[in-house]
Structure formats: structure tokens, C-alpha cells
Amino acid sequence: NHSLGNLIILAEIKLQGSTQKAIESLSKILNLKGKVLPFTEDKVTLVGKMEDNTIVEGEHNITKYPKKIKAVYYKEEPTISDELLNEIKTANLILLSMGSLFTSVIPNLLSKDIKTAIDKSTAKIVYCCNLFTQPGETDDYKVSDHIKTLNKYLGNKKVNYVIANTGEINTELAKKYSNEEQKDPIVLDKEKTEKLGVEVITDNLVYIKEHTNTFKSKTVFRHNYVKLGFLINTIALDYAYMLKNK
């Protein structure tokens, strides 16, 4: 649950005194592998400029506004830690994950320092495309639209790979369970996407999950994390092999 996860993180931040310490504490509790670094320790406000030129502040308000999003930016310039910038500069692979395009993914790119660090790295950029469009954010978006939008917010380096679903999604079931997170299955316009200089990696990535609690049962569509992990690792290993044998 997204909201519950946010509440747990906020509670831990209050206990630990900083976002980084909170993440370290939760990582130990959950026995997480790898390193998780916050985008910033600053309190920043996400701002959306809508297609009617209205300025809307706050993630929730941006998504709920009845017009399409034209652009997003921060009201304040975020301070980025040297540790995070160094991790980006020395990375072999930069993964832009699935999630709300304008209010979850792109906000991580809204910093000059982050863009510069990405440009200085030798990493390839991989985008894992969502299964569905999101109401209020990506209505009518195809895979190529996601790539074009991301490239607008990146610096000199652009998306190199996209992982996209080619598995069939039951349209009736999808309509029945459409909600604020998922609307229409995203169409892969492969030829148009490849013309953007992106290598398209595909598979049947659909995983249907039943959420049940005391009050109701809900069906949600998710990525098959086993297949997704395999594809990401394959891209990473292929690129590492290429660098080694240059």
C-alpha cells in the first residue's frame, strides 16, 4: 500500500531525524539488499503547469486537476548529496522505474546536479514502462510518448532501452478494475519508439494480483517481478561485458 508505506517512512523520519537515517533503519528492519539514498533531505514542493497554464502545487493536486500536465518542476532548488551524485556518476546502469510518470519518476530528474551526474556517467539508461496509462497524468500515452517525455527532462544522455509489456491484458477485466492508478493498457508503438534511438525489450510482463481485506477484494495488475528482474540483469550483464571487452 503506497499510502501506508509513506506513513511508515514519515514516522521513521520523525524518530531518526533525517530521511537518510530513516531509510537506513528501515533497510535493516526489512533486511534489504543494496543501498537506498534519498533524492534530497530538503522539503520541496512539486509544481505542475497544466495545459490551461494553471499552476498547481502538490503531487495529489496535480494528479487530480482536470487538465493535462504540461510540465513539472520544484518550487525550490533541491540540495543533492555528494554521495548520491557519486553513485550516479559511477553507475553502470541507471533504471527509471515504473510509477506515476510526472509525479514519481520525473521528480527524480528535476535537479541540474542530477542531470550533470547522469551526463558524466558511462551508464546506459533503462526505462521500465508502465502497464497502464494513469488518469490525470498519461491519458492516451503510448510507449514512445513516455520516452519522449522522459527525454525532455534528461540532460544530454537519453533513454537507451525500454522494457515494455507485450502480454495480452483482458480488456473487460482491466475496465472493471480501472482506478486512479490504472486506466488503459499502454500500447507499444515499437517502430516509433525505435526511431527515438531506443532499443525495445519485450516480454509478457503481466501479473494479476488479488488484494483482499475485511471489507473488499480488489484485482490489480502488476509487473511480473521475476521476468522483469531477469531482463534488467540481462541488460546490465551485456553492457558490463561490452565495457570489459572494449
How does the language model describe each region?
Residues 140-246:
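C-terminal functional extensions of proteins
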Residues 62-77, 128-148:
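Active-site rim loops that border cofactor/substrate pockets in soluble metabolic enzymes
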Residues 38, 42-102:
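Active-site gating loop/helix substructures
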Residues 87, 112-120:
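Catalytic-core regions built around general acid/base machinery
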Residues 1-65, 223, 227-238, 243:
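Electropositive, gly/pro-rich neighborhoods at or near active sites that engage anionic ligands
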Residues 108-115, 141-146:
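Charged helix-capping and loop-helix junction motifs
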Residues 31, 42, 117, 139-140:
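Non-transmembrane, aqueous-exposed alpha-helical and coiled segments at domain scale
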